[in-house]
Structure formats: structure tokens, C-alpha cells
């Protein structure tokens, strides 16, 4: 009888143990890697979004020749001819590459998981949307009509992957919506001008709006007769920058040369944002 009681006690303890295991907190069982970044364990805070957007700074570089600036409209003849000959592929295509835009969309699709100060979170969402606007307008300058994607596509999204190009008007309106969000939600300048803040986003908005306005004014074949609204956006953005009182034209002898031939631009009040080159940190042109 005593043996049977002991067996029953052991069985009861085992049953309670099983119940305890089945009642464990799900988060205890679902542990994510603590030594590598995973999608499930990331995008939880504004700090995560900041880390992710740091990688996007390379999407806007200092243009060291006119073909890479908005002073010259670059025609993608080489890429077009390569495509006609069947030679174009993801490894040799340049402007037609979509990896950077997908990286931005990847973050934007998951940014709603972030918790904390919404002003901080929206700053980095606005920053990402500004980068997407710049990346997309580069494609518009080269091809005019391009497919617009607002989310990161998967290999199973065959319909969207093979969809035709969207009209320039739709793409540019989407670009301007990204820039509107950026200038509304990004924080005002704070600290070094080597980081993107609202004034930098306003400058990007002005630059893209002015370029698009000029295209629509002088290219009637587009059938887009609303250049003036883009000129107004550009003018309003420039006025907003001036109204901050943080910037002023560089004047005096050698002022123009100082803009392009100085080792340190941190004290130049004409700089809205600049890249600080440093041999020590390995940041070079």
C-alpha cells in the first residue's frame, strides 16, 4: 500500500511538472539570437531604426562629376543597348538595380513594431522615406516611367515583380508624398551637420521639385502641364530653410573656393549637410 502511495505521489509530481512546462511563457521558449541581428528581434525601438538607417547614408553621396549630379540628364543608352542584346542582368545593371529601394521598404514595412517616443520613431521613418524618394527620382531621371513599389517584394510576388512600368506622374507623386512626410516628421537640426535632419530633407525636396518642375516645363511631350506646382514646392522648401536662421551665404574673399576646397566645413554656415572626410576614420572621397 505504501509503495502504491509513493508511485501515486511521483506520478502526481510528474503531472504537475508537465503542466508547468506547458504553462511556460511563450517568450521563454521563443528565444532569439543574442549574437546576431534577426528580423524577429529587431525593429523594436527608435534606436533600432537609427541603426538600420545609418546604412542608408551611402545612398546619397557627394557627386564628383556632372553626370552624377542633376546638372546633366544621363541617358541610359549603354544599359538599353545591353538589354536589347540580352546582356543586362542584376550583376551589371546600375541604375536599374532595386536592392537599395528594397532595403528601405524592408524597414518601412516593419517600423510599426517599434515602441517608444513616436517623434523619434517618425524621424527615422521620415529619413527612410527621404532616401527612398532620392533613389526613386534617380530612376525617374534615367527612365521616366518606372514600377513603383512601396513594400519589399518576395520571390513569390511574381505579379508585382513582372508588372509594367508605372506612369511618371504616379511615381513622382509618390516621391513627393515621401518627401512631404519627411519634412513634416524629421527633427530640426541638432548637433553635427553630417547627419540628416529636417533642413536636409527640405533641401532634398527643393532639389527634386525644382528638377521635376523644369522637366515638365520644357518637355511638353510628357503631357504633364503642372510645372508651377513643383516650382512652388521648391520655393516653399527653400524659404523654410532660410526661416530657420541656421544658415547663411558664405561671403568674402575666397568664399566660393572655401565651399569646395576646405578640409573642414563644420564652421561654414552655408553647409546644410556635408560629408566629413577623415583619414583616421577611413572616410574618403
Locations of the language-model features?
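C-terminal motif of bacterial Sec signal peptides marking the signal peptidase cleavage site
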Residues: 21-23
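Short coil/turn linking the two alpha-helices of tandem helical-hairpin repeats
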Residues: 140-141, 147, 190, 211-220
Amino acid at each position: 500500500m505504501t509503495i502504491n502511495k509513493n508511485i501515486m505521489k511521483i506520478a502526481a509530481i510528474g503531472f504537475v511538472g508537465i503542466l508547468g512546462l506547458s504553462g511556460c511563457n511563450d517568450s521563454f521558449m521563443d528565444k532569439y539570437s543574442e549574437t546576431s541581428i534577426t528580423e524577429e528581434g529587431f525593429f523594436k525601438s527608435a534606436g533600432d531604426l537609427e541603426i538600420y538607417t545609418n546604412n542608408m547614408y551611402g545612398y546619397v553621396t557627394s557627386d564628383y562629376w556632372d553626370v552624377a549630379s542633376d546638372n546633366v540628364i544621363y541617358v541610359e543608352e549603354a544599359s538599353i543597348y545591353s538589354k536589347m542584346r540580352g546582356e543586362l542582368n542584376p550583376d551589371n545593371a546600375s541604375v536599374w538595380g532595386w536592392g537599395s529601394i528594397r532595403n528601405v521598404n524592408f524597414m518601412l514595412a516593419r517600423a510599426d513594431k517599434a515602441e517608444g517616443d513616436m517623434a523619434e520613431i517618425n524621424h527615422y521613418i521620415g529619413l527612410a522615406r527621404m532616401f527612398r524618394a532620392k533613389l526613386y527620382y534617380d530612376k525617374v531621371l534615367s527612365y521616366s516611367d518606372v514600377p513603383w513599389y512601396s513594400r519589399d517584394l518576395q520571390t513569390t510576388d511574381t505579379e508585382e515583380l513582372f508588372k509594367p512600368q508605372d506612369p511618371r506622374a504616379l511615381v513622382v507623386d509618390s516621391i513627393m508624398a515621401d518627401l512631404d512626410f519627411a519634412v513634416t516628421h524629421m527633427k530640426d537640426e541638432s548637433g553635427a551637420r553630417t547627419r540628416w535632419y529636417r533642413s536636409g530633407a527640405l533641401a532634398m525636396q527643393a532639389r527634386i521639385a525644382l528638377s521635376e518642375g523644369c522637366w515638365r516645363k520644357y518637355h511638353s511631350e510628357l503631357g504633364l502641364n503642372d510645372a508651377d506646382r513643383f516650382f512652388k514646392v521648391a520655393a516653399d522648401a527653400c524659404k523654410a530653410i532660410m526661416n530657420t536662421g541656421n544658415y547663411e551665404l558664405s561671403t568674402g574673399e575666397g568664399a566660393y573656393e572655401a565651399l569646395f576646397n576646405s578640409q573642414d566645413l563644420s564652421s561654414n554656415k552655408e553647409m546644410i549637410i556635408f560629408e566629413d572626410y577623415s583619414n583616421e576614420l577611413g572616410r574618403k572621397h
